[in-house]
Curated annotation (Swiss-Prot):
Residues 58-320 are lumenal. Keywords: Acyltransferase, Endoplasmic reticulum, Glycoprotein, Membrane, Signal-anchor, Transferase, Transmembrane, Transmembrane helix. GO terms for cellular component: endoplasmic reticulum membrane; plasma membrane. This is Glutaminyl-peptide cyclotransferase.
Length: 320
């Protein structure tokens, strides 16, 4: 820290002492007050600069419980390629495992499953059905084990990556089981609320959790999850939106708007489709894949900057 200059202290003292002797006490007080006020201005500016410098970046521009202005981080999409997808698959979890191989979990009572799928053909190579009492939900891969959660229960299951045989069930501590993802160490989970959970994969105990908000409003119905470039991406149920979330503190980092996909399917006559759900990431080739429940297609997409009107769309369509 810089030391104060004795020259500046002496100059200020000299200016005060140089007041005429005939000046009244009130004049001297007014002069001193003006000088004190003048000195307070640069001090206040300096204090403000120091405060801003040490503030966490993700709290700039936001009040308690609100989010940053994300207008520069709202993306729409372009379709790079289309692939066949089982139109009877009620997709709940999706992941890419290399060599053009996908793993997918499906839902609905009596139809829930975990499956290994060929990306190019959409062919189901291995299928493991769940007990009819379970409604399959999110899926992720950690090491050689697939982890899956189920709807309306705290029970989940692990599967052997090679043949999809069940290894053992587990109990988690989320309110419900919706989505799962991993960074290779921890598991991230969603339960249909606005909460993003971090869990220990050995014990399934919750080690951290955060409420996700946008402009002060909770982003509810976080569904299928994927870990992409140090972010957790979440489908928002009943919408064509993906929320980009910081796994460190739950702050909202951006939005991806994908309504053109469902519109295109409906326009081409696929009236039986359900909502967008399913994100898969090929980290080696930087390829991004998405699909939906009962969708006949799976898409490879890339992001592009959204139009200026997208902010209104988020308020109306993403915050369901």
């Amino acid at each position: 820290m810089a030391t104060r200059s004795p020259y500046k202290r002496q100059t200020k003292r000299s200016m005060i002492q140089s007041l005429p002797a005939s000046s009244s006490a009130s004049s001297r007080r007014r002069f001193i007050s003006r000088k004190r006020f003048a000195m307070m201005i640069p001090l206040a500016l300096l204090s403000g600069a120091v405060f801003l410098f040490f503030m966490p970046f993700n709290s700039w521009g936001q009040s308690s419980g609100s989010s940053l202005d994300l207008s520069h981080r709202i993306n729409e999409i372009e379709v790079v390629a289309e692939f066949p997808h089982d139109p009877d698959a009620f997709t709940q979890g999706l992941l890419y495992a290399g060599n053009d191989t996908l793993f997918e979990s499906t839902g609905l009572y009596g139809k829930s499953s975990v499956r290994k799928v060929d990306l190019r053909t959409g062919k189901v190579e291995i299928l493991e059905k769940m007990d009819n009492t379970y409604f399959g939900e999110g899926l992720t891969l950690l090491g050689e084990r697939l982890f899956q959660v189920a709807w309306l229960t705290n029970t989940g299951f692990t599967y052997d990556l090679r043949n999809l045989s069940k290894v053992k069930p587990f109990k988690h501590h989320m309110k419900d089981g919706w989505g799962l993802a991993t960074d290779g160490k921890a598991l991230f989970g969603s339960d249909g609320t606005s909460t993003l959970y971090r869990m220990d994969p050995q014990t399934m105990k919750v080690t951290d959790k955060h409420i996700v908000r946008y402009n002060g409003r909770e982003v509810r119905y976080l569904n299928e999850l994927e870990y992409i470039n140090n972010e957790v991406w979440a489908n928002v149920w009943q919408s064509d939106c993906i929320a980009r979330i910081s796994p460190k503190d739950g702050s909202l980092l951006g939005w991806i708007l994908l309504s053109k996909l469902s519109r295109g399917l409906l326009k081409s006559g696929h009236r039986g489709i359900d909502v967008l759900n399913g994100i898969a990431w090929d980290s080696d080739k930087q390829r991004l894949f998405v699909t939906g429940k009962l969708w006949p297609k799976l898409y490879q997409i890339k992001l592009k900057q959204a139009s200026a009107k997208s902010g209104n769309y988020i308020e109306q369509q993403c915050l369901v």
